[in-house]
Design a protein with these regions (language model features):
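P-loop NTPase switch module centered on the Walker A-proximal segment
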Residues: 1-93, 105
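Residue-level signature of catalytic and energy-coupling elements of molecular machines
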Residues: 13, 19, 38, 66, ...
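C-terminal effector modules of nucleic-acid-centric enzymes and ribosome-associated factors
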Residues: 5-9, 146-149, 153, 163-166, ...
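Conserved Switch II/interswitch segment of TRAFAC-class P-loop GTPases
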Residues: 81-83, 88-94, 102-126, 130-155
Length: 416
């Protein structure tokens, strides 16, 4: 049974936590004692219905404010597949949490309040979904009950969002629209009795039917070395293994490999996983690889196939960045750049453009990027990094920028 990773997104109070609670409730994924606790908590708030958002708004601050701050991971399953949902914050102050929560998902559920329509934070979340290359985006027009389930309202919002989607850089991604009511369970797991005019799938049907190809297994092979194993025991006196997680592609015993950045070459002798010898391993597998010759390999080196084009050694390059700090990004600033497990200093050479997420237009010649703004930059690193263009190999094309004094993550970037 496969696992589908999903992330919710949307502005504050668009109903993300309620939607997830509804999915859990209607798929019988909530225990009896939790339902009883939910009933008690809902009555305490003076409600005559189950406040399903309380299932995921776990932090005390979230319950008091009625918003999601941290990224909560929720698990449920159907007879078809298992699901992991990242309930990400909608408030603009917590956009960084949304970027983190959506970084490795296959489906993004972007909620829109039917009363509000398109707002800036919705446009920002669409831009982030496009930037992260999330394969499927479902735009859920929620709270249809508050607009009397009017088809005209849904179509009006859909039209404005369709225009925005057309202007956004979605490449090979599927974008669809659903009218729903999380509060009353309309079009979540069963057809909406109050919206007979909508003939499409329910949300759960969309999720169940979604199929995706694991593209990373077919990308260029990359194996970042996380740890060098040298037991130095009687039984394993000469053993030298390289442990890590294959980030993309496939490696087989007998493959000729090249080490980056040194350029040394060798051949794979064995691949082991949990002390079991394998003939091959693919993206996502955590393994230990041994080579036929003793060469100098350290933590942070990357193994690639000698027959493939090696990841370029980048020192001066361009990137798209989402800025996550209150202190603006300006040319000349220096940060720590972390790519995989490697960290080096990086200096911002230039901000080439800033994206207007609503108009989907770029402004050139800007001198800063402020909190939650998206733009393109040029930067120079102290040491080269073995990185691919993000669009071709997402697992090896992303990085973060870190403030070297506060150690806070201030930006997330994508190599272009």
């Amino acid at each position: 049974m496969d696992i589908l990773r999903i992330a919710t997104a949307g502005s504050v109070d668009d109903g993300k936590s309620t939607l997830i609670g509804r999915l859990l409730y209607e798929t019988n994924s909530i225990t009896k004692d939790k339902i009883e606790a939910l009933e008690t908590a809902s009555k305490r708030k003076g409600l005559d219905f189950l406040d399903l958002s309380l299932l995921t708004d776990g932090l005390i601050a979230e319950r008091e404010q009625g918003i999601t701050i941290d990224v909560a991971h929720i698990y449920f399953s159907t007879p078809t597949r298992k699901y992991i949902i990242a309930d990400t914050p909608g408030h603009v102050e917590y956009t960084r949490n949304m970027v983190t929560g959506a970084s490795n998902v296959k489906v993004s559920l972007i909620l829109v309040d039917a009363r509000q329509g398109l707002v800036e934070q919705t446009a920002r979340h669409l831009s982030i979904a496009a930037m992260l290359r999330i394969p499927k985006v479902i735009i859920c027009i929620n709270k249809m009950d508050l607009v009397q389930y009017q088809e005209s309202t849904f179509e009006e919002i859909k039209a404005s969002l369709t225009e925005l989607v057309a202007q956004t850089t979605f490449e090979g991604q599927d974008v669809s629209f659903l009218p729903i009511s999380s509060l009353y369970g309309q079009n979540i797991t069963t057809k909406a009795e109050h919206m007979p005019w909508f003939t499409g799938n329910t949300l759960l049907d969309e999720l169940e039917a979604f199929e995706y190809a694991e593209t990373l297994a077919h990308a260029s092979a990359r194996f970042p070395v996380q740890f060098v194993i040298r037991p130095m025991t009687e039984a394993y006196h000469d053993f030298r293994g390289y442990a890590g997680k294959i980030s993309s592609g496939t490696f087989q015993v007998g493959d000729a490999i090249r080490v980056l950045p040194t350029g040394q070459e060798s051949t794979i002798a064995t691949i082991e996983k949990f002390e079991t010898k394998l003939s091959n391993a693919k993206a996502g597998d955590s393994v230990v690889i041994t080579l036929s010759t003793d060469i100098d390999i350290s933590r942070g080196n990357t193994l690639v196939l000698a027959s493939e084009t090696a990841a370029p050694q980048l020192k001066d390059f361009a990137a798209q960045v989402c800025w996550l700090d209150h202190q603006a990004l300006t040319p000349g600033n220096t940060y720590l750049l972390q790519h995989g497990i490697n960290i080096t200093k990086a200096k911002i050479s230039q901000i080439t453009e800033r994206l207007d997420v609503v108009a989907q237009t770029a402004t050139e010649g800007v001198d800063s990027l402020k909190l939650n703004e998206i733009g393109r930059i040029a930067l120079r690193t102290a040491q080269p990094i073995s990185a691919d263009v993000y669009a071709k190999n997402p697992s090896n094309g992303a990085f973060i920028l870190i403030d070297e004094f506060s150690n806070s993550t201030v930006g997330v970037g994508f190599v272009q």
